[in-house]
C-alpha cells in the first residue's frame, strides 16, 4: 500500500509543477500590468481633478520665457540685433553664400520665385539702395512715399472698386492684368536680409510695385515677360539682380525666344527704362483712377509689341507649317 501511494504522488507531481509554471508567469504579468496601467489610470485621474500641475506656476509664461531664451541664444550668434520686424542679420560670409546659392538656383530654376527673392536681397548692396533713396528724396512723390511708407495690399487697393472703374483707367487695367495672370499683390515676400530699415522699406516698395510695371506695359508673367521687366527695372532703377537677369536669363531660353528678346523686347526695355521717369517715385496707389494712356504719356512709357499676340502668331504659324509638312509626307508616302 505504501508503495502504491508513493507511485501515485510521483505521478501527480509533474501536473502540479506545470500548473505552478503557468500560474507564476501569469501572476507576474498581472502585477506588471497593474503597475503600468494603474499608474496611467492614476495619472489620468489626477489630470482630470487638476491635481497634476502646480496651480501656482504659469506654464504658458514659462513656455514663452523658454522660447525667448532660445531666440536670445540664436540672436547672440548674429552680427547685430534685428532692426525691424522679420529682420534676419547675416554675417558677410553668409551673404556671400546666399548670393552664390540663390544665384545658382535662380539660373537653373527661374520658375521658383523663392530663388529670385533671395537673389534680389543678396545683390541689393547698400550703395545701390542708398542711391535709390537719394533718387526718392530728390522727388516730391518719392519723399512722401518714404515718409508715409505705404504698404500695397488688396485691402488697401480695394480690388472690388478697381473692378468697377472705367475701362480706360489704370486701376481697371491693373485689375484685369491681375485677374488674367492669376496673381495678387498680397503674395510679395517680406524683406529679411537687408540691414538698414529704410533700405529694407525701399526694396520692399520696389518689390511691391513690380506688378504695376507689368500692368502698365501689358507684359505677361511668362519667362520672356519677366526678363523684359527686369531689364526695364535694371535700366530705370539700377537694380543689380534685374541687370543680371537681363543679361544671363536669356541664355537658357529657346532660340526663338532669345531672338524675340534680343531683337524686340530687350532694346525696348533698355530704351524705355533710360528715358522714362524713375518708377520708384510713382505713387501708384494715387494713379489708379487716371486714364492709362495719359499716365503712360506722363511717365514717358511706350507700349512694346504684344508678347502674347506674338507667341500666338508664332504657334499658329508653326502649326500651319507642321500641317503642310505632314500633308506632303502622306502624299509622297506609297500606299
Curated annotation (Swiss-Prot):
Pathway: Cofactor biosynthesis; ubiquinone biosynthesis
Chemical reaction(s) catalysed: 4-hydroxy-3-methoxy-5-(all-trans-hexaprenyl)benzoate + H(+) = 2-methoxy-6-(all-trans-hexaprenyl)phenol + CO2
Residues engaged in binding Zn(2+): 210-211, 214, 226
InterPro entries in alphabetical order: Coq4 (IPR007715), Coq4_euk (IPR027540)
Cofactor(s) recorded in Swiss-Prot or TrEMBL: Zn(2+)
Keyword Transit peptide in record: yes
UniProt keyword annotation of Isomerase present: no
Membrane disposition: Peripheral membrane protein
Documented effect of changing residue 226 to K: In COQ4-1; abolishes coenzyme Q biosynthesis, but does not affect stability of other COQ polypeptides
Transit peptide interval: 1-10
A Pfam family the protein falls into: Coq4
GO biological process terms, semicolon-separated: ubiquinone biosynthetic process
Enzyme Commission number(s) from the entry: 4.1.1.130
Keyword annotations from UniProtKB, A to Z: Lyase, Membrane, Metal-binding, Mitochondrion, Mitochondrion inner membrane, Transit peptide, Ubiquinone biosynthesis, Zinc
Family named by the database record: Belongs to the COQ4 family.
Functional description taken from the UniProt entry: Lyase that catalyzes the C1-decarboxylation of 4-hydroxy-3-methoxy-5-(all-trans-hexaprenyl)benzoic acid into 2-methoxy-6-(all-trans-hexaprenyl)phenol during ubiquinone biosynthesis. May play a role in organizing a multi-subunit COQ enzyme complex required for coenzyme Q biosynthesis. Required for steady-state levels of COQ3, COQ4, COQ6, COQ7 and COQ9 polypeptides.
HAMAP family in the cross-refs: Coq4
Identification of the protein by name: Ubiquinone biosynthesis protein COQ4, mitochondrial
Gene: COQ4
Amino acid at each position: 500500500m505504501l508503495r502504491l501511494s508513493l507511485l501515485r504522488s510521483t505521478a501527480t507531481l509533474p501536473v502540479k509543477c506545470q500548473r505552478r509554471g503557468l500560474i507564476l508567469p501569469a501572476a507576474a504579468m498581472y502585477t506588471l500590468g497593474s503597475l503600468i496601467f494603474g499608474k496611467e489610470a492614476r495619472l489620468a485621474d489626477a489630470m482630470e481633478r487638476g491635481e497634476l500641475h502646480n496651480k501656482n506656476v504659469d506654464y504658458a509664461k514659462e513656455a514663452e520665457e523658454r522660447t525667448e531664451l532660445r531666440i536670445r541664444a540664436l540672436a547672440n550668434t548674429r552680427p547685430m540685433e534685428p532692426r525691424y520686424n522679420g529682420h534676419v542679420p547675416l554675417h558677410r560670409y553668409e551673404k556671400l553664400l546666399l548670393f552664390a546659392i540663390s544665384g545658382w538656383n535662380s539660373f537653373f530654376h527661374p520658375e521658383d520665385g523663392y530663388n529670385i527673392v533671395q537673389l534680389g536681397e543678396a545683390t541689393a548692396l547698400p550703395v545701390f539702395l542708398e542711391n535709390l533713396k537719394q533718387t526718392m528724396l530728390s522727388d516730391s512723390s518719392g519723399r512722401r512715399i518714404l515718409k508715409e511708407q505705404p504698404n500695397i495690399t488688396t485691402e488697401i487697393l480695394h480690388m472690388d472698386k478697381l473692378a468697377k472703374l472705367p475701362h480706360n483707367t489704370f486701376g481697371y487695367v491693373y485689375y484685369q492684368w491681375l485677374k488674367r495672370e492669376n496673381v495678387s499683390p498680397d503674395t510679395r515676400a517680406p524683406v529679411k536680409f537687408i540691414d538698414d530699415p529704410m533700405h529694407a522699406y525701399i526694396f520692399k516698395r520696389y518689390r511691391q510695385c513690380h506688378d504695376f510695371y507689368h500692368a502698365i506695359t501689358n507684359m505677361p508673367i511668362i519667362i520672356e515677360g519677366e526678363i523684359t521687366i527686369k531689364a526695364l527695372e535694371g535700366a530705370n532703377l539700377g537694380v543689380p539682380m534685374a541687370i543680371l537677369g537681363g543679361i544671363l536669363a536669356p541664355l537658357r531660353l529657346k532660340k526663338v525666344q532669345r531672338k524675340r528678346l534680343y531683337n524686340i523686347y530687350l532694346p525696348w526695355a533698355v530704351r524705355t527704362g533710360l528715358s522714362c521717369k524713375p518708377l520708384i517715385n510713382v505713387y501708384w496707389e494715387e494713379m489708379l483712377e487716371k486714364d492709362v494712356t495719359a499716365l503712360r504719356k506722363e511717365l514717358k512709357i511706350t507700349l512694346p509689341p504684344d508678347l502674347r499676340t506674338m507667341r500666338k502668331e508664332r504657334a499658329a504659324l508653326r502649326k500651319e507649317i507642321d500641317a503642310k509638312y505632314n500633308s506632303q509626307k502622306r502624299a509622297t508616302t506609297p500606299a
